[in-house]
């Protein structure tokens, strides 16, 4: 089985490469920047311009599409560039699209673009599997709990997460390779739904920190959707 991993320099892409190493697959990777210490064949490609896409997808059976851009050129990469990629996949046996839980319910631009990409994939002729996951542990840590301010975590304490280990999700995606196209799967979620305040309390206890917690409220549809747990799924508790 010949596999292409896009976005091989990102967090999910790196986790995929770590676990694909040593498995009985022919693996090719593609990105704009060549990863350090590459163990696989690397091909340059750019979703923004479309440059290198044909060479990247040539002679592969399965694509795991880990390329994404939450903050920069999001529309051009998540939608416009994605359309360019889909147009070159007539020969593909399976396209695995990692996505995010709740993107159809949370009013956030990047999520709307991911949902648009899901719809483009569904309406294409490409055989696909869509696998949605909740936020990674590292995302919650780096975005909200990485640096206390004057020995206090100043956080929107009521918002909820069901964070998951990126390596667990990567392992799950690799297991899908030999299962063929399955459409949209059940959500892949972390084991516990917790408020950000509860996460901060747990971090303080585990690390024996002396930091305090200051929970502050926000307003708006995005904040309310996270309080309601639209980014979680209590029926799916996985990794």
Question: Locations of the language-model features?
Answer:
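Mid/C-terminal beta-alpha module of Rossmann-like enzyme folds, strongest
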Residues: 2, 10-11, 167-239
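Conserved beta-loop-beta element that borders a ligand/cofactor-binding pocket
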Residues: 99, 119-139
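NAD(P)H-binding glycine-rich loop region in Rossmannoid oxidoreductase-like domains
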Residues: 35-92, 100-106
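SDR active-site strand-loop-helix element
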Residues: 6, 30, 66-67, 95-100, ...
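N-terminal Rossmann NAD(P)H-binding glycine-rich loop of SDR-like oxidoreductase domains
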Residues: 1-25
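Conserved glycine-rich Rossmann-like NAD(P)H-binding loop of the short-chain dehydrogenase/reductase
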Residues: 25-32
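Short-chain dehydrogenase/reductase
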Residues: 6, 75, 79, 107-115, ...
